[in-house]
């Protein structure tokens, strides 16, 4: 009985993922979609866009950085929300 209880506790911890971290897209403009787990405590994702001689450039990642004027920044707080 104790073994069954211990097994249920372990399964619950694994399923609940108590060490939960945010997941954000991190692929550049023209690359296939990829995402990564953010560092613990980082609860937002960003999508940063600007134009240069190559066209519109997009950068994605974890956090919500400060940007220079002329750069469009969108920050969000859900899974893979920065595409």
Swiss-Prot record:
Pfam families: Toxin_cobra-type (PF21947). Expressed by the venom gland. InterPro entries: Snake_3FTx, Snake_toxin-like_sf, Snake_toxin_con_site, Toxin_cobra-type. Keywords: Acetylcholine receptor inhibiting toxin, Disulfide bond, Ion channel impairing toxin, Neurotoxin, Postsynaptic neurotoxin, Secreted, Signal, Toxin. It is found in: Secreted. Gene3D superfamilies: CD59. The keyword Secreted applies. PROSITE patterns: SNAKE_TOXIN. One of its GO terms (molecular function) is toxin activity. Disulfide bonds join 24-45, 38-62, 64-75, 76-81. Coiled coil: none annotated. The keyword Secreted applies. GO terms for cellular component: extracellular region. Residues 1-21 form the signal peptide. Binds to muscle nicotinic acetylcholine receptor (nAChR) and inhibit acetylcholine from binding to the receptor, thereby impairing neuromuscular transmission. Belongs to the three-finger toxin family. Short-chain subfamily. Type I alpha-neurotoxin sub-subfamily. This is Short neurotoxin OKI-01/OKI-19. It comes from Laticauda laticaudata (Blue-ringed sea krait).
């Amino acid at each position: 009985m104790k073994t069954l209880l211990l097994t249920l506790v372990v399964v619950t911890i694994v399923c609940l993922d108590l060490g939960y971290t945010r997941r954000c897209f991190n692929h550049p403009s023209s690359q296939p979609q990829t995402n990564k787990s953010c560092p613990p405590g980082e609860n937002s994702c960003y999508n940063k866009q600007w134009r240069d001689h190559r066209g519109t450039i997009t950068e994605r990642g974890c956090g919500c950085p400060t940007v220079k004027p002329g750069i469009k920044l969108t920050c969000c707080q859900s899974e893979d929300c920065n595409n």
